UniProtKB/Swiss-Prot annotation:
UniProt cross-references to Pfam families, sorted A to Z: Usp
Domain of life: Bacteria
Organism: Escherichia coli O157:H7
Gene coding for it: uspG
Taxonomy of the source species: Bacteria, Pseudomonadati, Pseudomonadota, Gammaproteobacteria, Enterobacterales
Name the UniProt record assigns to this protein: Universal stress protein G
Annotated NCBIfam families: PRK15456.1
Length: 142
């Protein structure tokens, strides 16, 4: 069906991503590749030279933790693990999804979403932001 699927995930909220796993697998069928993407918030404080080394160490720790959790998440899939790639980036989910989609020539984004609440209506959510700014089809799984 689809050759390249991007699945943004929050490794610190796995149950939200678990919903989307089966849909991503279905879309991947026999030869598609699923790219798991976890986005950590970017740090604007690197301009504070006095704290730059501490911030970098903290970001490296977060990245390492996210990579380990992504590796654990691969076991939730039933498809061949070699067809699941992992990406950890810093920035906004919306921008990083679009950037990775362009780099890979992705066909579709599959993203889990919780039922909307007052806070997501007021502040927006990652899923709604991805939908509004995506240059490719987005499947939202609830």
């Amino acid at each position: 069906m689809y050759k390249t699927i991007i699945m943004p995930v929050d490794v610190f909220e796995m149950e939200l991503s678990d919903k989307a796993v089966r849909h991503a697998e279905f879309l991947a069928q026999d030869d598609g590749v699923i790219h798991l993407l976890h986005v950590l918030p970017g740090s604007a404080s690197l301009s504070l030279h006095r704290f730059a080394a501490d911030v970098r160490r903290f970001e490296e720790h977060l990245q390492h933790e996210a990579e380990e959790r992504l590796q654990t998440m691969v076991s939730h899939f039933t498809i061949d693990p070699s067809r699941i790639k992992q990406h950890v980036r810093f920035g906004s989910v919306r921008d990083e999804v679009n950037e990775l989609a362009e780099e890979l020539g992705a066909d579709v984004v599959v993203i889990g979403s919780r039922n909307p609440s007052i806070s997501t209506h007021l502040l927006g959510s990652n899923a709604s932001s991805v939908i509004r700014h995506a240059n490719l089809p987005v499947l939202v799984v609830r």
